[in-house]
Amino acid sequence: MFTGIIEELGTVREAEEGRLIINAAKVLWGTNLGDSIAVNGVDLTCTYLEEDGFHASVMPETYRRTNLGELRPGDVVNLERAMTLAQRIGGHLVRGVIEHTGTLESFTPEGDAIIARYQAPPEILRYVVVKGPITIDGVSLTVIDKTSDSFAVSLVEFTQEHTNLTRKRPGDRVNLESDIIARYVGQLLEERPAGK
C-alpha cells in the first residue's frame, strides 16, 4: 500500500522489455531487495539495488494496463516507497494496482494552481466522485469536476514542482487508480442479489 504522496522524482536510465532501471536517491533509504516502490503509481518489486538507483521487473500485464511501456531513458517518473504502519497517510490509501490509463486533455491556469482535465474510461469514472480521491501516475489528488467522459483535478504549486504531472502534454497517457473504498463498495453493491 502507498499514500499517493510522491517522495522523489526519479529518472529512467534503461527501459528494456520486462525491466526498468531507475536513477533515484531518497527512495533507496531503507529499501531492501523485494521491497515495493511505486513507479508512476505502479507497484513494482525492487529486484536489484545500486548506489544511485534500482532495477524492477515489469510483467506483460503491467505493460498492457499502464503507461510504463512508453517510458524511455531520460523520462522523469514519480516514486514512492510502500507505506509503513507508523507513518501518516497524507494522501489516501493507494494499492499501486492500475486499473486503466487515461489521457491528459488540457491544462488551465487558475491563480497559482493548474486545472488538469483527463479523459477516462467508464470503468474508472463510475468510481470517481467530486471531492473524492483519485490517483494519477501515483499522485493522490482530489477530484473537482466530473463529466460523462472526463474529470478534473487542481494541481497546487507544490504538486506542480514535486511530481511529473505538469511535464505531460495533451494526449499523453497517465495511470489511473480509483479510490479503493469506492471501488469495493461499488463492487459489493453490484454483486448483491436483486431485491435485497
What do these predicted ranges mean?
Residues 1-196:
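Conserved loop->alpha-helix
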